């Protein structure tokens, strides 16, 4: 019997994927649970990844004409009461503030000073931003109104999981107002495409782009679109959404404008957002049984040097050797930003430091000892490959660093894209459909592409098997066929999957 390969993370993905996910977060020192149930503490490595995502996406948002602003965390209950469908969708998740101070009674602090109107802690900002739009927009000359905010939101979560489902999470939410439905729809799809490009080119995470079915729409939206990614366990993760809100919110909040002809019309609005859930997607898309593998575009530190010192004088020798290398690398660019280079000078054993960076998923890890200095080289580990250092001349590292990082980025994307392609199957019969989902193992789960009639009475069968409809992909064949669930006529194909 062969001996099991030793891994830095236990259990492995195959043994217990949910627990493996938690252990990767712990091993990479990204985040931890907080004393507040359902909330997380994002540690520097995890927050550095979020900052890299922010920088890239913020640039894309601004390049499409949007400006950043900030709105209050607290929303008057009366604002939410104006939009019944919206409130119904979030009612069970809302945190509500009812008092404005604490007083000491019998040695304990108790709430006092009941508010005249309860305040809801922001679950999303359509209502309070809509209130501002109603003041800011008077004429067609004020349109389109294009704003974005980076903020935190709160939605009570019964089954929390770090990055994937937390009571408080970080996100960006874009909100826009337009004169016509066509302009608003163009905006909705434009920002969906921004998300697709960011997910694939920056996170190295391939996605399926499409429209959500009616029962999965954002509360109060006319249409919701999403990008859906496959995790390594074959489950789907909704990685971003963009909503065409029609005139529902503008009518509820009186967002009107005077037309060029002197008439008055309600605006058409949109909203769109992604959150720290993306980090969970990066983990489950790319990490392996030795820890995280961070796509270079979002790695807080892209090249890490680990000095190997054994005798007096080694430290100074290696420092002198690394100084010009670090200087030359730090002057280079990758992905539109300066290379992020780090020398780990902590007083820890070199193997301990090396394994820490392996578990964190730094794209390039270079060990440097006296023999490497003598040979003018480094022992380079690429986190997308074997963990044995390859002797690399220092001049080659300096000249090819950006190209190596780009190759790692492409490798991670290709691995994920290959898995998505190989584990997405098209079926035409209910028997085949159920046979695919009968395999509920980590590496056996698949996405199913099949026709669906759109009738709500078919959803009970999906609930029975814990299967969801992810979206209606944009790339449709348009051919007539039958619904895989009901046998009724159907032309649209949808993506069925187990999901997070």
UniProtKB/Swiss-Prot annotation:
Gene3D superfamilies: Anticodon-binding domain (3.40.50.800), Bira Bifunctional Protein, Domain 2 (3.30.930.10), C-terminal domain of ProRS (3.30.110.30)
EC numbers on record: 6.1.1.15
Domain of life from the UniProt record: Bacteria
GO molecular function annotation: ATP binding; proline-tRNA ligase activity
Keyword DNA repair: no
Cellular location(s): Cytoplasm
Enzyme class: ligase
GO biological processes: prolyl-tRNA aminoacylation
GO cellular component: aminoacyl-tRNA synthetase multienzyme complex; cytoplasm
Keywords: Aminoacyl-tRNA synthetase, ATP-binding, Cytoplasm, Ligase, Nucleotide-binding, Protein biosynthesis
Catalysis: reaction(s): tRNA(Pro) + L-proline + ATP = L-prolyl-tRNA(Pro) + AMP + diphosphate
SMART domains registered for this protein in UniProt: ProRS-C_1
Function: Catalyzes the attachment of proline to tRNA(Pro) in a two-step reaction: proline is first activated by ATP to form Pro-AMP and then transferred to the acceptor end of tRNA(Pro).
Notes on the domains: Consists of three domains: the N-terminal catalytic domain, the anticodon-binding domain and the C-terminal extension.
UniProt-recorded name of the protein: Proline--tRNA ligase
Organism of this sequence: Paramagnetospirillum magneticum (strain ATCC 700264 / AMB-1) (Magnetospirillum magneticum)
Upper classification of the organism: Bacteria, Pseudomonadati, Pseudomonadota, Alphaproteobacteria, Rhodospirillales
Gene, per the UniProt record: proS
């Amino acid at each position: 019997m062969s001996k099991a390969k030793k891994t830095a993370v236990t259990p492995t993905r195959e043994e217990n994927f949910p627990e493996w996910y938690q252990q990767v977060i712990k091993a990479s020192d990204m985040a931890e649970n907080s004393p507040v149930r359902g909330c997380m503490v994002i540690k520097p490595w995890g927050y550095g990844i979020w900052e890299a995502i922010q920088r890239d996406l913020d640039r894309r948002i601004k390049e499409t004409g949007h400006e950043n602003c900030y709105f209050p965390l607290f929303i008057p209950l009366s604002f939410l009461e104006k939009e019944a469908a919206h409130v119904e969708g979030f009612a069970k998740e809302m945190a509500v503030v009812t008092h404005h101070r604490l007083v000491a009674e019998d040695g304990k602090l108790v709430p006092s000073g009941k508010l005249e109107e309860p305040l809801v802690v922001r679950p999303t900002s359509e209502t309070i931003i809509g209130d501002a739009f109603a003041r800011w927009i008077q004429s067609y000359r004020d349109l389109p109104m294009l704003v974005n905010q980076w903020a935190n939101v709160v939605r009570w979560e019964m089954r929390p999981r770090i990055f994937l489902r937390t009571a408080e999470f970080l996100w960006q939410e874009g909100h826009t107002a337009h004169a016509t439905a066509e302009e608003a729809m163009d905006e909705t799809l434009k920002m969906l495409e921004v998300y697709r490009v960011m997910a694939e080119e920056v996170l190295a995470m391939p996605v399926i782009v499409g429209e959500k079915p009616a029962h999965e729409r954002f509360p109060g939206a006319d249409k919701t679109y999403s990008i859906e990614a496959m995790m390594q366990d074959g489950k789907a993760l909704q990685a971003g959404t963009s909503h065409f809100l029609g005139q529902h919110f503008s009518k509820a909040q009186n967002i009107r404008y005077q037309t060029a002809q002197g008439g008055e019309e309600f605006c058409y609005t949109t909203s769109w957002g992604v959150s720290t859930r993306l980090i969970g997607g990066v983990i489950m898309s790319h990490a392996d049984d030795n820890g995280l593998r961070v796509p270079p575009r979002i790695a807080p530190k892209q090249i890490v040097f680990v000095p190997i010192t054994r005798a007096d004088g080694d430290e100074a020798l290696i420092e002198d050797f690394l100084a010009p290398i670090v200087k030359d690398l730090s002057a280079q660019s990758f992905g539109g930003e300066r290379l992020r280079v780090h020398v780990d000078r902590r007083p820890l054993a070199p193997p301990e430091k090396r394994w820490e960076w392996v578990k964190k998923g730094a794209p390039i890890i270079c060990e440097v000892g006296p023999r490497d200095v003598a040979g003018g080289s480094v022992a380079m580990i690429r986190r997308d490959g074997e963990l044995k250092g390859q002797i690399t001349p220092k001049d080659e590292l300096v000249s090819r660093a950006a190209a190596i990082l780009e190759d790692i980025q492409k490798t991670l994307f290709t691995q994920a894209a290959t898995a998505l392609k190989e584990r997405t199957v098209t079926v035409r019969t209910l028997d085949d459909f159920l046979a695919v989902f009968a395999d509920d193992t980590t590496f056996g789960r698949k996405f199913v592409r099949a026709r669906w009639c759109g009738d709500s009475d078919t959803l009970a069968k999906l609930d029975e098997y814990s299967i969801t409809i992810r979206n209606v992909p944009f790339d449709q064949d348009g051919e007539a066929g039958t619904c895989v669930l009901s046998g009724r006529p159907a032309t649209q194909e949808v993506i069925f999957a187990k999901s997070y």
